């Protein structure tokens, strides 16, 4: 039985939590919001709260994210980010 992209996201978070400290998880991963996964292009879009979080994830956790997303989504998954800096006014920037 095939699982939904949202379920794949939940599996990803569980695997990430097993590989980082609770403080790291709460600081860097808990604020991430799953936006969508395009199965045809294998593109995963996630929302992060700031450019700093995006940069920190890329510099410090890209290997872990790649490994986990390859396992839970697709071997060809392409990670994209949307920085949502102001949810009230829906200000965002795709990275």
PLM-predicted stretches and their roles:
Residues 1-95:
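Intrinsically disordered, low-complexity basic tails and flexible linkers associated
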């Amino acid at each position: 039985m095939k699982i939904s992209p949202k379920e794949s996201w939940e599996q990803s978070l569980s695997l990430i939590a097993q590989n980082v400290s609770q403080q790291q998880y709460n600081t860097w991963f808990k604020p991430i919001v799953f936006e969508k996964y395009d199965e045809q292009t294998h593109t995963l879009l996630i929302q992060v709260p700031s450019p700093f979080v995006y940069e920190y994830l890329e510099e410090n956790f890209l290997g872990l994210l790649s490994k986990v997303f390859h396992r839970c989504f697709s071997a060809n998954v392409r990670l994209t980010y949307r920085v949502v800096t102001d949810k009230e006014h829906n200000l965002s920037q795709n990275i």
